[in-house]
């Protein structure tokens, strides 16, 4: 489309990501674990600072972005890493005491401030991601399966109450999810355009920069949340299968590394 601003931002983010990967490879995770309390506090500060007017930027109904000049930074993305590093240490200290509600309450209390700050933004999507991270870590730590079932039941029963406190745009997204074929719902426009893009790509796609949905801006937020639809339109099912394969390889490698960890914290 002639707009290279996203190319610049994505390239800058890519370079920063490479430096972070190199840094992580050079630092022993046990060294980071020694500073889990500091990381815990820093994580909360990063989520809280964007709630201050004039510092945090609002997008899509949520104040979750920090403007750093040429690069907009979503603090929750960094917090995902620092939270895992700090929370893993907390879970490790109680890994043999996760069999009853009484045992799990102290561990959950550590996570509540994070979920509270995310709801305050309000960023329901990221809050759900954090909830899944917490659940996954507790499950890995040996949380009793019957206790997991009870927690799921409590969450399901609480859904109507949670819905009452949701922001209007969040309710709109849920309504769109429950009624995906209703074109009158604003939240369905992007999903429908992405389905058109993927469907029109066929097996091999229309070719790079030849997608009508993406190049003519029918598909919003195509550079981030809906990049997969662009891949489907321009590279077809072959391109999508390749991307899914990369994710599968990445996940397999992650699980292998976790199983090879020398201690519970590394897992």
Predicted regions and their residues:
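Hydrophobic alpha-helical transmembrane segments of multi-pass inner membrane proteins, especially
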Residues: 2-190, 229-267
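Extracytosolic (periplasmic/ER-lumenal) interhelical loops and adjacent juxtamembrane/interface segments
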Residues: 190-209
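Long extracytoplasmic/lumenal interhelical loops at the membrane interface
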Residues: 203-235, 258-261, 265
